[in-house]
């Protein structure tokens, strides 16, 4: 387990800023202590500095996971967010999409959100902006990327895709063996 390099930190923070904007600072300097990001086996973990000190007593080859997995770096050094980061990103989300109850299940199975399933969308959402997807009861369901701006969503055909699927809480079941 090691600290992220400058390039890795820049790549990860660019990805996080698509979803939570400048609120990244609030992830690091929290009222309950200082938190940090560490890399282990191409996965980025988010943990308190207390847990970090305790984890140094475990050898690298024996350490499976520590803290919360925020995502992983691909072989081409792109950063992919994991669904395990949802609980930390949801309170700070800048752009949100609410899904109608009939389309929740479709999204949780890994499908994109159609206009017919769109309940609400945050004003001034840009095209290809990272959004957090919520149920109409304000329960965070996952991440997505806006396929259209807020204004385009109002005029588009009901079967057009408005949010591209990135990750959802159904992955806890579908990918339970690969989430660490």
UniProtKB/Swiss-Prot annotation:
One GO term (biological process): ribosomal large subunit biogenesis
A Pfam family reported for this protein in Swiss-Prot or TrEMBL: UPF0113
Gene3D superfamilies, sorted: 3.10.450.220, PUA domain
Segments of this protein annotated with the region N-terminal domain: 1-92
Domain of life the protein comes from: Eukaryota
Residue span, PUA domain: 94-170
Positions of region (C-terminal domain): 93-180
N-terminal signal peptide: none
Keyword hit for Hydrolase: no
Xref: PROSITE patterns: PUA
SUPFAM superfamilies for the chain: Pre-PUA domain, PUA domain-like
GO terms under cellular component: nucleolus; preribosome, large subunit precursor
Job description of the protein: Required for proper 34S pre-rRNA processing and 60S ribosome subunit assembly.
Family listed: Belongs to the NIP7 family.
Subunit structure: Monomer. Interacts with pre-ribosome complex. May bind to RNA. Interacts with NOL8. Interacts with FTSJ3.
Protein name: 60S ribosome subunit biogenesis protein NIP7 homolog
